[in-house]
């Protein structure tokens, strides 16, 4: 396979060298334009999420807020590398930034992939505890703080992405003046066994970075939906609107994650398995040509997360409004009176402010532990 393919931005595959790819063309300015759009939206959106979380007082933050902030950090760390990849793609896969940035930017891609999905899984589990098991798991949620959990997730993500840092390098493409950023397995494998390393790393990253976390998220949201539906069956008719709203948001969160990442992992896995299954060259070429677009779709997730996990919350929107019209007199009152409380815990599971149902330290008293009352996404 030609080393200029976008697959080689990640693995440097060469498992179907018997096929001819002379008809393959790069995507010109389209893919770089998408990368830069994701860069602009991702830096703005994730920066706004971090600003909203950390402007609140520490005692008002809950574990879900830490997961939200960690997710934003992962996405922000990744999107700042996109100008490098946009340049690389625009130059028809000619890397001008040297070996160090080849290693670092590639490493950050995979750290982001693992850290993001782990944070989403942690957030899903946090919602599960808050809605399905609010009383029985209260002590667990207090013992294992969001900060400790996210620290463990980040360490795990950094370790899982380490093969990319070690094996990534740059080299001249044969018979051209182009410099490629690719995975070099020669330091750990013979030529005949490189495909095994490639397939092993590719399949394992899909399993650990998508299949297992997505299964956990689906399980959490299944029990959340079941609990919400069971509760609202006891409510009056007007409660049906809240049920539909919450359940639809849950569906949007899960489906969006799947739509963004499933094409990437599916196409990547199919291509990697080509060494074993010997796909026809036409199908192999098809996989290689659509992979750059699947990659773009997965990257878009890094700029959608702020909207999906924060902008659905009216309290977060209030905080954004307070910031955007910070210098205007018409917003001064709102900014001083409500932004501190309303932006303190915009994430799901812990966003109810002090009130008649709050105990010491702002902990929720369980008046039968109404599940939906702990879910910000149903606030009118």
UniProtKB/Swiss-Prot annotation:
Annotated phenotype, changing residue 183 to A: Decreased APELA potency. No change in APLN/apelin-13 potency
GO cellular component entries: plasma membrane
Transmembrane segments: 31-54, 65-86, 100-125, 147-164, 199-223, 247-270, 290-312
Glycan attachment sites: 15, 175
Stated name of the protein: Apelin receptor
Subunit relationships: Homodimer; dimerization inhibits APLNR-mediated G protein and beta-arrestin signaling pathways compared to monomeric APLNR.
Positions of the record's site feature: Required for APELA and APLN/apelin-13 interaction and signaling: 85, 168
Effect of residue 110 to A: No change in APELA potency. No change in APLN/apelin-13 potency. Decreased G(i) signaling and no change in beta-arresting signaling after APLN/apelin-13 induction
Gene: APLNR
UniProt keywords, alphabetically: Angiogenesis, Cell membrane, Developmental protein, Disulfide bond, G-protein coupled receptor, Gastrulation, Glycoprotein, Host-virus interaction, Membrane, Receptor, Transducer, Transmembrane, Transmembrane helix
One GO molecular-function entry: mechanoreceptor activity
Species this chain originates from: Homo sapiens (Human)
Residue intervals on the Extracellular side: 1-30, 87-99, 165-198, 271-289
Region (Disordered): 342-380
